[in-house]
Amino acid sequence: MEVLDKAVNGYIDHLLGPKDPRVRGWLLLDNYVPTILFTALYLFIVWRGPKYMQNRPPVSCRGILVVYNLGLTLLSLYMFYELVTGVWEGGYNFFCQDTNSGGDADTKIVRVLWWYYFSKLIEFMDTFFFILRKNNHQITVLHVYHHASMLNIWWFVMNWVPCGHSYFGATLNSFIHVLMYSYYGLSAIPAMRPYLWWKKYITQCQLTQFVLTMTQTTCAMIWPCKFPMGWLYFQNCYMISLIILFGNFYIKTYNKKTSSRRKEYQNGSASAVNGHTNSFSSLEDNVKQRKQRQD
Protein backbone atom coordinates (compact mmCIF):
# COMPACT_ATOMS: atom_id res chain seq x y z
CA MET A 1 0.00 0.00 0.00
CA GLU A 2 2.86 2.37 0.82
CA VAL A 3 4.41 1.75 -2.60
CA LEU A 4 1.05 2.44 -4.27
CA ASP A 5 0.64 5.64 -2.23
CA LYS A 6 4.03 6.93 -3.32
CA ALA A 7 3.48 6.03 -6.97
CA VAL A 8 0.02 7.60 -7.24
CA ASN A 9 0.79 10.72 -5.25
CA GLY A 10 4.17 11.18 -6.93
CA TYR A 11 2.50 11.15 -10.34
CA ILE A 12 -0.21 13.60 -9.26
CA ASP A 13 2.30 15.98 -7.70
CA HIS A 14 4.39 15.89 -10.86
CA LEU A 15 1.31 16.61 -12.99
CA LEU A 16 -0.28 19.36 -10.89
CA GLY A 17 2.60 20.78 -8.89
CA PRO A 18 2.95 21.21 -5.11
CA LYS A 19 -0.14 20.91 -2.92
CA ASP A 20 -1.47 23.71 -0.78
CA PRO A 21 0.45 23.50 2.55
CA ARG A 22 -2.60 24.60 4.56
CA VAL A 23 -4.21 21.16 4.22
CA ARG A 24 -1.10 19.07 4.90
CA GLY A 25 -1.91 16.31 7.39
CA TRP A 26 -5.68 16.73 7.11
CA LEU A 27 -7.84 13.60 7.18
CA LEU A 28 -7.96 11.81 3.78
CA LEU A 29 -6.12 14.61 1.95
CA ASP A 30 -2.45 13.59 2.08
CA ASN A 31 -2.95 10.53 -0.13
CA TYR A 32 -5.33 10.02 -3.05
CA VAL A 33 -5.45 6.23 -2.60
CA PRO A 34 -8.11 6.23 0.20
CA THR A 35 -10.43 8.34 -1.97
CA ILE A 36 -9.87 5.96 -4.90
CA LEU A 37 -10.59 2.95 -2.67
CA PHE A 38 -13.77 4.50 -1.26
CA THR A 39 -14.95 5.22 -4.80
CA ALA A 40 -14.08 1.70 -5.98
CA LEU A 41 -15.96 0.21 -3.01
CA TYR A 42 -18.94 2.44 -3.79
CA LEU A 43 -19.02 1.32 -7.42
CA PHE A 44 -18.65 -2.33 -6.38
CA ILE A 45 -21.64 -2.03 -4.03
CA VAL A 46 -23.63 -0.30 -6.79
CA TRP A 47 -22.84 -3.28 -9.04
CA ARG A 48 -23.27 -6.14 -6.56
CA GLY A 49 -25.79 -4.67 -4.11
CA PRO A 50 -28.94 -5.02 -6.24
CA LYS A 51 -27.96 -8.59 -7.10
CA TYR A 52 -27.48 -9.39 -3.41
CA MET A 53 -30.90 -7.93 -2.57
CA GLN A 54 -32.65 -9.54 -5.55
CA ASN A 55 -34.16 -12.46 -3.62
CA ARG A 56 -34.34 -10.70 -0.28
CA PRO A 57 -37.13 -8.51 1.10
CA PRO A 58 -36.57 -4.73 1.06
CA VAL A 59 -35.30 -3.23 4.29
CA SER A 60 -37.42 -0.50 5.84
CA CYS A 61 -35.01 2.30 6.72
CA ARG A 62 -37.65 4.87 7.62
CA GLY A 63 -36.33 5.86 11.05
CA ILE A 64 -32.71 5.87 9.92
CA LEU A 65 -33.63 7.93 6.85
CA VAL A 66 -35.25 10.64 8.96
CA VAL A 67 -32.11 10.93 11.11
CA TYR A 68 -29.75 10.67 8.11
CA ASN A 69 -31.52 13.33 6.07
CA LEU A 70 -31.89 15.61 9.08
CA GLY A 71 -28.16 15.27 9.76
CA LEU A 72 -27.24 16.19 6.18
CA THR A 73 -29.72 19.06 6.23
CA LEU A 74 -28.06 20.52 9.33
CA LEU A 75 -24.55 19.92 7.96
CA SER A 76 -25.49 21.63 4.68
CA LEU A 77 -27.00 24.55 6.57
CA TYR A 78 -23.82 24.89 8.65
CA MET A 79 -21.62 24.85 5.55
CA PHE A 80 -23.80 27.38 3.74
CA TYR A 81 -23.73 29.78 6.70
CA GLU A 82 -19.99 29.46 7.24
CA LEU A 83 -19.20 29.91 3.56
CA VAL A 84 -21.40 33.00 3.21
CA THR A 85 -19.95 34.62 6.34
CA GLY A 86 -16.40 33.65 5.33
CA VAL A 87 -16.81 35.19 1.88
CA TRP A 88 -18.21 38.35 3.45
CA GLU A 89 -15.41 38.60 6.02
CA GLY A 90 -12.74 38.05 3.38
CA GLY A 91 -14.21 40.57 0.96
CA TYR A 92 -14.18 37.98 -1.81
CA ASN A 93 -14.45 39.25 -5.37
CA PHE A 94 -17.33 37.64 -7.27
CA PHE A 95 -15.56 37.88 -10.62
CA CYS A 96 -12.30 36.23 -9.56
CA GLN A 97 -10.76 35.42 -6.19
CA ASP A 98 -7.31 33.92 -5.70
CA THR A 99 -6.45 31.50 -2.90
CA ASN A 100 -4.14 33.65 -0.77
CA SER A 101 -5.52 37.17 -0.38
CA GLY A 102 -8.44 36.60 2.00
CA GLY A 103 -6.43 36.39 5.22
CA ASP A 104 -8.16 34.61 8.10
CA ALA A 105 -11.28 34.21 5.96
CA ASP A 106 -9.34 31.90 3.64
CA THR A 107 -8.54 29.65 6.60
CA LYS A 108 -12.22 29.55 7.50
CA ILE A 109 -13.21 28.73 3.92
CA VAL A 110 -10.61 25.93 3.73
CA ARG A 111 -11.95 24.37 6.92
CA VAL A 112 -15.57 24.47 5.74
CA LEU A 113 -14.71 23.13 2.29
CA TRP A 114 -13.02 20.13 3.91
CA TRP A 115 -16.38 19.33 5.49
CA TYR A 116 -17.95 19.80 2.07
CA TYR A 117 -15.50 17.27 0.61
CA PHE A 118 -16.18 14.84 3.48
CA SER A 119 -19.94 15.24 3.04
CA LYS A 120 -19.57 13.76 -0.44
CA LEU A 121 -18.31 10.57 1.17
CA ILE A 122 -21.27 10.54 3.58
CA GLU A 123 -23.65 10.99 0.65
CA PHE A 124 -22.65 7.58 -0.72
CA MET A 125 -25.25 6.38 1.78
CA ASP A 126 -27.96 7.78 -0.53
CA THR A 127 -27.24 4.94 -2.94
CA PHE A 128 -26.87 2.30 -0.25
CA PHE A 129 -30.35 3.15 1.08
CA PHE A 130 -31.76 2.76 -2.44
CA ILE A 131 -30.19 -0.70 -2.64
CA LEU A 132 -31.45 -1.81 0.79
CA ARG A 133 -34.98 -0.61 -0.02
CA LYS A 134 -34.76 -2.17 -3.52
CA ASN A 135 -35.40 1.16 -5.23
CA ASN A 136 -33.06 0.21 -8.06
CA HIS A 137 -34.86 2.49 -10.53
CA GLN A 138 -33.33 5.42 -8.65
CA ILE A 139 -29.75 4.22 -9.18
CA THR A 140 -29.31 5.96 -12.51
CA VAL A 141 -26.24 6.94 -14.52
CA LEU A 142 -26.79 10.52 -13.33
CA HIS A 143 -26.97 9.46 -9.69
CA VAL A 144 -23.84 7.29 -9.74
CA TYR A 145 -21.82 9.69 -11.91
CA HIS A 146 -22.63 12.66 -9.70
CA HIS A 147 -21.88 10.90 -6.41
CA ALA A 148 -18.68 9.18 -7.52
CA SER A 149 -17.23 12.18 -9.36
CA MET A 150 -17.87 14.80 -6.68
CA LEU A 151 -15.80 13.02 -4.03
CA ASN A 152 -12.83 12.70 -6.38
CA ILE A 153 -13.05 16.20 -7.80
CA TRP A 154 -13.15 17.73 -4.36
CA TRP A 155 -10.09 15.77 -3.23
CA PHE A 156 -8.17 17.60 -5.94
CA VAL A 157 -9.83 20.94 -5.16
CA MET A 158 -8.93 20.64 -1.48
CA ASN A 159 -5.30 19.88 -2.23
CA TRP A 160 -4.66 22.60 -4.83
CA VAL A 161 -7.35 25.30 -4.69
CA PRO A 162 -9.03 24.89 -1.26
CA CYS A 163 -10.43 28.42 -1.08
CA GLY A 164 -10.74 31.49 -3.27
CA HIS A 165 -12.88 30.99 -6.37
CA SER A 166 -13.71 27.41 -5.30
CA TYR A 167 -16.24 28.68 -2.77
CA PHE A 168 -19.07 29.55 -5.16
CA GLY A 169 -20.30 26.16 -6.36
CA ALA A 170 -20.01 24.67 -2.86
CA THR A 171 -22.03 27.53 -1.38
CA LEU A 172 -24.87 27.13 -3.88
CA ASN A 173 -24.80 23.34 -3.58
CA SER A 174 -24.97 23.50 0.22
CA PHE A 175 -28.08 25.67 -0.01
CA ILE A 176 -29.69 23.30 -2.53
CA HIS A 177 -28.90 20.36 -0.25
CA VAL A 178 -30.68 22.06 2.64
CA LEU A 179 -33.82 22.01 0.50
CA MET A 180 -33.22 18.55 -0.92
CA TYR A 181 -32.36 16.63 2.24
CA SER A 182 -35.10 18.35 4.24
CA TYR A 183 -37.53 17.20 1.52
CA TYR A 184 -36.35 13.59 1.67
CA GLY A 185 -36.29 13.59 5.45
CA LEU A 186 -39.86 14.85 5.62
CA SER A 187 -40.98 12.44 2.89
CA ALA A 188 -40.02 9.56 5.19
CA ILE A 189 -42.71 10.74 7.64
CA PRO A 190 -46.15 9.58 6.38
CA ALA A 191 -48.06 12.49 7.91
CA MET A 192 -45.91 15.02 6.06
CA ARG A 193 -46.20 13.60 2.54
CA PRO A 194 -49.39 15.43 1.49
CA TYR A 195 -47.66 18.76 2.16
CA LEU A 196 -44.52 18.13 0.10
CA TRP A 197 -44.96 19.83 -3.24
CA TRP A 198 -41.56 21.28 -4.09
CA LYS A 199 -39.58 18.31 -5.44
CA LYS A 200 -39.89 19.56 -9.02
CA TYR A 201 -38.45 22.92 -8.00
CA ILE A 202 -35.40 21.29 -6.40
CA THR A 203 -34.32 20.07 -9.83
CA GLN A 204 -34.96 23.53 -11.27
CA CYS A 205 -32.80 25.02 -8.51
CA GLN A 206 -30.03 22.53 -9.29
CA LEU A 207 -30.05 23.45 -12.97
CA THR A 208 -29.98 27.13 -12.01
CA GLN A 209 -27.04 26.38 -9.72
CA PHE A 210 -25.03 24.87 -12.57
CA VAL A 211 -25.75 27.82 -14.87
CA LEU A 212 -24.77 30.34 -12.17
CA THR A 213 -21.58 28.41 -11.41
CA MET A 214 -20.66 28.43 -15.10
CA THR A 215 -21.37 32.16 -15.26
CA GLN A 216 -19.17 32.91 -12.25
CA THR A 217 -16.42 30.62 -13.56
CA THR A 218 -16.52 32.31 -16.96
CA CYS A 219 -16.15 35.69 -15.23
CA ALA A 220 -12.82 34.50 -13.81
CA MET A 221 -11.72 33.54 -17.32
CA ILE A 222 -12.61 36.96 -18.72
CA TRP A 223 -11.24 38.95 -15.76
CA PRO A 224 -8.53 36.60 -14.45
CA CYS A 225 -6.70 36.80 -11.15
CA LYS A 226 -4.15 34.37 -9.72
CA PHE A 227 -6.64 31.49 -9.60
CA PRO A 228 -5.34 28.67 -11.88
CA MET A 229 -7.00 28.87 -15.30
CA GLY A 230 -6.95 25.09 -15.82
CA TRP A 231 -9.30 24.57 -12.88
CA LEU A 232 -11.76 27.04 -14.38
CA TYR A 233 -11.85 25.21 -17.72
CA PHE A 234 -12.38 21.90 -15.94
CA GLN A 235 -15.16 23.36 -13.81
CA ASN A 236 -17.09 24.60 -16.83
CA CYS A 237 -16.72 21.24 -18.60
CA TYR A 238 -18.04 19.45 -15.52
CA MET A 239 -20.96 21.88 -15.20
CA ILE A 240 -21.89 21.22 -18.84
CA SER A 241 -22.00 17.47 -18.15
CA LEU A 242 -24.29 18.04 -15.16
CA ILE A 243 -26.59 20.38 -17.10
CA ILE A 244 -26.98 17.73 -19.80
CA LEU A 245 -27.68 14.90 -17.34
CA PHE A 246 -29.94 16.84 -14.97
CA GLY A 247 -31.72 18.49 -17.90
CA ASN A 248 -32.40 15.08 -19.42
CA PHE A 249 -33.72 13.86 -16.05
CA TYR A 250 -36.00 16.89 -15.74
CA ILE A 251 -37.42 16.54 -19.25
CA LYS A 252 -38.07 12.80 -18.91
CA THR A 253 -39.56 13.09 -15.43
CA TYR A 254 -41.70 16.21 -15.51
CA ASN A 255 -42.50 16.79 -19.18
CA LYS A 256 -43.57 13.16 -19.48
CA LYS A 257 -45.76 13.54 -16.40
CA THR A 258 -47.37 16.71 -17.81
CA SER A 259 -48.00 15.01 -21.16
CA SER A 260 -49.51 11.98 -19.43
CA ARG A 261 -51.87 14.13 -17.35
CA ARG A 262 -52.93 16.07 -20.45
CA LYS A 263 -53.90 12.84 -22.20
CA GLU A 264 -55.82 11.66 -19.14
CA TYR A 265 -57.82 14.89 -19.02
CA GLN A 266 -58.52 14.69 -22.75
CA ASN A 267 -59.92 11.20 -22.20
CA GLY A 268 -62.05 12.47 -19.32
CA SER A 269 -60.34 10.21 -16.82
CA ALA A 270 -57.80 12.31 -14.97
CA SER A 271 -56.51 10.37 -11.97
CA ALA A 272 -55.98 12.08 -8.62
CA VAL A 273 -52.48 12.27 -7.21
CA ASN A 274 -51.26 13.52 -3.86
CA GLY A 275 -48.88 16.16 -5.21
CA HIS A 276 -45.65 14.24 -4.73
CA THR A 277 -44.03 10.86 -5.14
CA ASN A 278 -41.40 9.09 -3.13
CA SER A 279 -40.37 5.52 -2.48
CA PHE A 280 -42.81 5.06 0.39
CA SER A 281 -45.92 6.59 -1.15
CA SER A 282 -48.77 4.84 -2.89
CA LEU A 283 -51.42 6.56 -4.92
CA GLU A 284 -55.15 6.15 -4.87
CA ASP A 285 -56.81 3.34 -6.83
CA ASN A 286 -53.64 1.27 -6.55
CA VAL A 287 -51.92 3.40 -9.20
CA LYS A 288 -48.27 3.62 -8.23
CA GLN A 289 -45.96 6.21 -9.74
CA ARG A 290 -42.18 5.98 -9.30
CA LYS A 291 -39.78 8.81 -9.97
CA GLN A 292 -36.03 8.86 -9.92
CA ARG A 293 -34.25 10.84 -7.28
CA GLN A 294 -32.07 13.31 -9.07
CA ASP A 295 -29.21 13.58 -6.58
Swiss-Prot record:
Localisation: Endoplasmic reticulum membrane; Cell projection, Dendrite
Transmembrane segments: 26-46, 64-84, 112-132, 150-170, 175-192, 207-223, 227-247
Enzyme Commission designation: 2.3.1.199
Keywords associated with the record: Cell projection, Endoplasmic reticulum, Fatty acid biosynthesis, Fatty acid metabolism, Lipid biosynthesis, Lipid metabolism, Membrane, Transferase, Transmembrane, Transmembrane helix
Reaction it catalyzes: a very-long-chain acyl-CoA + malonyl-CoA + H(+) = a very-long-chain 3-oxoacyl-CoA + CO2 + CoA; (6Z,9Z,12Z)-octadecatrienoyl-CoA + malonyl-CoA + H(+) = (8Z,11Z,14Z)-3-oxoeicosatrienoyl-CoA + CO2 + CoA; (9Z,12Z,15Z)-octadecatrienoyl-CoA + malonyl-CoA + H(+) = (11Z,14Z,17Z)-3-oxoeicosatrienoyl-CoA + CO2 + CoA; (9Z)-hexadecenoyl-CoA + malonyl-CoA + H(+) = 3-oxo-(11Z)-octadecenoyl-CoA + CO2 + CoA
Polar residues composition-biased segments: 266-284
GO cellular component, one term: dendritic tree
Lineage: superkingdom: Eukaryota
Pathway field: Lipid metabolism; polyunsaturated fatty acid biosynthesis
Protein's GO biological process: fatty acid elongation, monounsaturated fatty acid; fatty acid elongation, polyunsaturated fatty acid; fatty acid elongation, saturated fatty acid; long-chain fatty acid biosynthetic process; long-chain fatty-acyl-CoA biosynthetic process; unsaturated fatty acid biosynthetic process; very long-chain fatty acid biosynthetic process
Residue spans of biased composition, Basic and acidic residues class: 285-295
Membrane topology: Multi-pass membrane protein
Keyword Methyltransferase carried by entry: no
Gene Ontology MF annotations: fatty acid elongase activity
InterPro entries: ELO_fam, ELOVL5
Positions of region (Disordered): 265-295
Predominant location: endoplasmic reticulum
Family (UniProt): Belongs to the ELO family. ELOVL5 subfamily.
Cited function: Catalyzes the first and rate-limiting reaction of the four reactions that constitute the long-chain fatty acids elongation cycle. This endoplasmic reticulum-bound enzymatic process allows the addition of 2 carbons to the chain of long- and very long-chain fatty acids (VLCFAs) per cycle. Condensing enzyme that acts specifically toward polyunsaturated acyl-CoA with the higher activity toward C18:3(n-6) acyl-CoA.
Protein name: Very long chain fatty acid elongase 5
Record lineage: Eukaryota, Metazoa, Chordata, Craniata, Vertebrata
Gene: elovl5
